Each structure stands twice: as structure tokens, then as C-alpha cells.
């Protein structure tokens, strides 16, 4: 499945964050561009009702690859994806466009971002987070930015091995629709594929590209390690309060299931337990999606267990990530590490 459709924090999907931020900011015309393996994503967002985007005009649009404009096998960069949805962009009547990855975690008011973009008279605004104090290997996962005193971007490095700056791009861009169309047309004509390297970097002297600093919690889910870490971070009450707040709520597709049942011997500590689970064993510092069954004597620590998995009696799990419908039979012991969690694919029986 697409990264943006992965379950996170038990009951949510990763894409819920960006969709909710846009909906909370009054954005009513949203297109979700897909590339491959998007059936679970389509099933999750459907008409957009949880985000109040099931509208007669505009609303939420799922945009599979346009194979008339870009052949499926030739999609090699985000310029190809944008070219494939150029009809949607052209038909949109809004002046400004916000581009964001669907696998990012944040909770931001885009109204403030657009207001700042207009006031600074920027051609392009890039959201960024100062990751000062983070290890270089973590910062190098991101595109890094150098800025002057006026917050104008003077240099861009795409995932540098030795980053010169701690200012990490969130891969969120604001610009006028007309400028985006011009960039996509020009890059497509030249055979350029990458929006940052082939468009923004090459146009830095000709465009006013500014940064907008975001000071809240953010990350992108680009690896198993990042997926595991972010799920575990949600167990931190400070991070949870920051991301899941009543002022800017995170919406998701709701499921009608019975409440979780806890047996007389069940023990749960600092965990997310979704509806429909049956807990008769021990769950510590873990995230369980809907319908997970944990039998008596089983112990789950520091793990992520997805929908409808079954953990039988006397199983011991630590630092594991299970996809949907995994079955672990009686007495098994599976131990991963925090830096290398053990991943088990959908439907596996061990």
C-alpha cells in the first residue's frame, strides 16, 4: 500500500494529518495524486466525508496517474505526477496552490502560511523545521535550506550526506497556480523530473523563494524505522496533546465496532488500543489497531500490531511491526530492536 495509507496511532492513517490540516484551514478543493498501490488509500478517503469534503463543487478528488499524459512505467519523479494531473490543476479556480507529501506528520494552520506568503511577496514559500541538535544522519533524510536574515532561501541541498544547515524542508510548498503550471510545463518540455532539483534549485536567482518556519512536531514516514519511531512517539503525552488538539482536530474514517474487551488477567500500560480488540494478556508501550486479539499469558512490548492480528497464548513480542491479519501461534518469541524493528507482512502465520 501507499505510505500515506499506512495505519498510525492505532485508528488513523498517515494522510489524515495533511487532509485534516487543509480542511481545518478552510481549503475546499483538494486533489490527492496517486502513483501506485492506491486501492487502500481510495478505500480510506473515498468521498472525503470525515473531512467535510463530500461537496457538489470541488471537495476531495482522488487523482490516479493520467496514462494519456504520462505512461505508467515512465513516472520517475514528482514533475511526472504533476504533469499527469495538469487538467485538474488547470480547472481549479483558486489563485494559490499548496503542495504537500501525503506521508508527512504535522498539525499546522495553512491560513497563516498563505497569509505570510502574500505579505512577503514570495513567489514560492517552503515550510521548514529547524532540526538543530538532531544527528546528521537524521537531518540528511530531508532537503536542507539555507536562509538569509529576511528568511529568503539562498541555497537548497537535496538529502545531503553532510548537511550544512539544520533547516529541514517539510516538502510543503505554496505558490500561485499560474506559476506551478508554468514550472510543470517547462520541466516537462525539457524532460526534467524533480520539482526541487530541476525547478526550484535552477530558478533560485529568478524567483523569490522564502521559508516559513514551523516549530511544532513534524516528521515524514519514509522508512520502517521512521514509521516505528513516530508510532512510539505518539505514546508521549506532550506530542499527543500537540498533534491531537480540539482547536485543530485530526479527522479519520470511523469504523463501527464494539468496544475493546479486557479479560480479568489483562494488563495494559501506556498503549493505544483501538476498538474491537480482545485483551487477555499484557500490552506495554504498544499500538494496537482494530480487532487485535491478545490471548492469556501473551506479552507485547514496544510494538505495533495492525488490524485483526491474533497473538496466541504465551507469545512474547518486543519491538515488532505486524501488518494486518498476522497470526502468532502459542509460545512463539519474536524480538526486534528499537533501531531495527522486526517487520512481519500481511497474513503471515508463525
Task: Describe the function of each predicted region.
Residues 1-233, 344-346:
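Unchanged
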Residues 178, 186-350:
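Left-handed beta-helix
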